[in-house]
Structures are given as structure tokens and as C-alpha cells.
Amino acid sequence: MKHWKRRSSAVFAIVLQVLVLLLPDPAVAMTMEQFLTSLDMIRSGCAPKFKLKTEDLDRLRVGDFNFPPSQDLMCYTKCVSLMAGTVNKKGEFNAPKALAQLPHLVPPEMMEMSRKSVEACRDTHKQFKESCERVYQTAKCFSENADGQFMWP
């Protein structure tokens, strides 16, 4: 478990460093191209840890949660959210932190939809006991409240 934590921390640090390089001026918002690149980087950091089908990951990418998730897929969503710093190890979503990070995580054209989704889904995790399912169901809620604009690593 400690090895996974160290590896996760290292991957997260690399992702943050690349994002800093992509956004040299903190006052400049992330472009859609940079956003898509960051999704790919996060996916490459989390996906190898789980037994996942590329087709399932591609469906999540476009907000399609209309298929039965495997435990690995649900835990993949937790890995992604841990990397983003929006959940804790118990799968509890931190809406204030997510709202504060939105300007650094999404391009301006997705900002309003993202805020709306965070507000609508802030307590979704409380309906579930298992940590991976908590995060998966929160991500699914985001998708359902995103007016067709949702994207996931």
C-alpha cells in the first residue's frame, strides 16, 4: 500500500509540474487543448493501476455512465479524484475545495457547467458506503448535471 501511495504522489507531482508548464501565467485560464492534454495525463497515471477496458474509459471520457461499472472502474474514478485533490481516501467529496480548484482544472467555457455540477452533486457521496462507489456515483452525478459538456480522464 505504501508503494502505491508513493507512486500516486509521484504521478500527481508530475501532473502538477506539467500543468504548471502548460499554464506559465496563473492569471491565464486553461485552454481546451491543455484541458484535454491534462485528462490524458491523469488517465495515464491512474488507468494502469486497474484492469480496465479502453472502451469503458472512452465512454467515461464523454460522460457516458450508462453501463454497469466494475469495481476497478469505480476505483479508477477514485484515483482520478484523489489526483485532483477533490476527495479523501474515504471517497468523501470536498465541494469547497473542488470549487476553489475549478479555475485551475477546467477551461473557461466549462466553468459555469462545472460549478453547477459541483453544487448539484456536493452530497451525492453521502448516499453510498464504499469509497470507490462514492466517487463513481459523484462523477456520474456530475455527468448528469453537465448539460452534455462533461469530460472525464
From Swiss-Prot:
1-propanol binds at residues 81, 86. Residues 1-29 form the signal peptide. SUPFAM superfamilies: Insect pheromone/odorant-binding proteins. Keywords: Behavior, Disulfide bond, Olfaction, Pheromone response, Pheromone-binding, Secreted, Sensory transduction, Signal, Transport. Its main location: secreted. Gene3D superfamilies: Pheromone/general odorant binding protein domain. GO terms for molecular function: dibutyl phthalate binding; diphenyl phthalate binding; odorant binding; pheromone binding. CDD domains: PBP_GOBP. Ethanol binds at residues 81, 86. PANTHER family: GENERAL ODORANT-BINDING PROTEIN 19A, GENERAL ODORANT-BINDING PROTEIN LUSH. Odorant-binding protein required for olfactory behavior and for activity of pheromone-sensitive neurons. Binds to alcohols and mediates avoidance behavior to high concentrations of alcohols, the alcohol-binding possibly resulting in activation of receptors on T2B neurons, the activation of these receptors inhibiting these neurons. Acts in concert with Snmp and lush to capture cVA molecules on the surface of Or67d expressing olfactory dendrites and facilitate their transfer to the odorant-receptor Orco complex. Required for cVA response, probably by binding to VA. This is General odorant-binding protein lush.
